[in-house]
Amino acid sequence: MRTWFHAVAIDYDGTLTLGRRPTDAVLAAMADARGAGLRIVLVTGRILSELRRDFPDVDAHVDAIVAENGGVVTHKGGGVRRAAPPLPSALADLLEASGVQLRRGMVLLATTMEYDAAVLAAVRRLGLECQLVQNRGELMVLPANTSKATGLEEALSDLGVSPHNCIGIGDAENDHSLLDACEVGVAVRNAIPALRTRADIVLEQENGAGIIEVLRDVVRGTVNAEPKRWQVELGTFDDGSPARIPASQRSILVQGASGAGKSYVAGLFAEGLLDLEYTICVLDLEGDHPALGERRGVVTVGGVDGLVPPEHVVRLIRHRLASVVVDLSLEPFETRKAYARTLLAELLERRADTGLPHWIIVDEAHVPLGPEFDAQCLVPRPQGLCLVTYRPEILCPTAATGHDIELDVRSPDVVILTRPGEPPRRFHPNRRDTVHVRHWHKYTAVPTAMALRFVFRGPGGPNGRTAGHLAEFDAELRAASDSVV
């Protein structure tokens, strides 16, 4: 799917249906979406056996079920497992002895809000750490730190989908965590006011009709939202307000003169993405981004270790959910260009299936994406693509135009942010978390011309030892005698 979203997590009661079973129209829309490659996860506070009693063929219509408000997870293999430890049986026994009408799940205890005081008193009496969660007129008693968000995380992990590639849809009090955990949170029209206020999108339709609306838009690739919780702060505007840009569903062009600070700004954006747990792949043609490899969850390949096959990079991202910096700086120019083109095409192809990496950052983009580049892989414009260049005029037309955001780096302290339909705004970049050294390997490992080499001298003059770059200089210095030093 050439769309950012690869999964939709849907609440059941009040969202997918108001009755015991979704309508035929809703089930048909779900089947069409799954046929287009979208995974559907049903996320409910219901006890699993009760859900299957009212909707016996539920497993045939979804890719996974999160039941008991995150406490139980199923998957397509037919397995059912607890995603949290069950509550002590002593609590259920005490509640039933107190006259509370109770239903026992694999993890949670379910009752109604009329018994909330009795439940709270029993929890206090036993000294338990648990939580009480309201769902309209229902009351659930759950282990601490168990929610629809925690259960969804496990279900998506089983499916190989990141929460950043998921839309969450709900209607009630226990859906707040579901919406917050997903890239975009959606409230159906009949949702409670608090959830409507918190949602990124509020649908025009209620429950099942709203679900049909969302699934249609996801398959078409027309979902458009900019959640404030998923933004990268790059600096400060002249008026003192933070300069933020969306962390997903956009394409970005970073341009500016050589030495102005383009790679610094691109690295600043990459750090922000990593802080928000997006998966990125940086094609580093000049060795500007080795410090990103020091971040947790980031792997560096290439450089002094030599290149790995492009499919190896794809596997690192797919199976380890790792971000990768591909250091091409020590390779010949034509090798860098050819490798970057091959890897970019392969990453985009695999991302259509998995959603990963969320972002591809191509530094020195004019090298692989010059005027002769066959730009079919860039049609339609990929979301999550950041091109960095000091020569935008020689980018192929498809790569040069149509970006959602442009960052014109005028100097290390001045960047102009431009978005379609908005006036350009100047901001001053933040400090980086990692050290930025421009063209690192060019100075540390690429040999200089003979006339520019370091020459070592002893008491009697030159001793025949030279160094063509900083790595050689360091080695020679360590081996030199005191008289040379």
Where are these regions (language model features)?
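Active-site phosphate-binding/coordination module
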Residues: 21-105
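P-loop NTPase catalytic phosphate-binding loop
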Residues: 228-359, 368-404, 454-485
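Phosphate-binding and hydrolysis-coupling loops of NTP-dependent motor/remodeling domains
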Residues: 221, 229, 404-484
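Conserved acidic, metal-coordinating active-site core of Asp-based
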Residues: 88-181, 190
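Walker B catalytic acidic pair
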Residues: 12, 285, 363-365
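Short, well-ordered beta-strand core segments
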Residues: 65, 185-187, 202, 385-386, ...
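Mg2+-dependent phosphoryl-transfer enzymes with acidic/Ser/Thr/Gly-rich catalytic loops
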Residues: 2-4, 23, 149-229
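Asp-based phosphoryl-transfer active-site loop
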Residues: 4-20, 179
